[in-house]
Amino acid sequence: MKTKLNELLEFPTPFTYKVMGQALPELVDQVVEVVQRHAPGDYSPTVKPSSKGNYHSVSITINATHIEQVETLYEELGNIDIVRMVL
């Protein structure tokens, strides 16, 4: 049985994205820029480097208002050239 994300969430709700990308200075700015387009606000993402330092993990939490917002952000964050994965 497959459960859909919108069946598990009650909106509005805090929703955290973890974005993994190349360890470049512009990664955080690009992530925040995309998030600001769909969920304007003040964000202070946390950044953790990988063990070898080649990648960074950026965690950012938004106040999601509907499932379409969540899905759109997954897609647009994944479309950033230096991003490798969005969880």
UniProtKB/Swiss-Prot annotation:
Q: Which residues form the signal peptide?
A: none
Supply the PANTHER family for this chain: UPF0250 PROTEIN YBED
Q: Return the InterPro entries for the record.
A: UPF0250_YbeD-like, YbeD-like_sf
Q: What is the lineage of its organism?
A: Bacteria, Pseudomonadati, Pseudomonadota, Gammaproteobacteria, Enterobacterales
Give the UniProt entry's GO cellular component terms: cytosol
Positions of disulphide bridges: none
Family statement: Belongs to the UPF0250 family.
Task: Return the protein name.
Answer: UPF0250 protein CKO_02527
Q: Which SUPFAM superfamilies match?
A: YbeD/HP0495-like
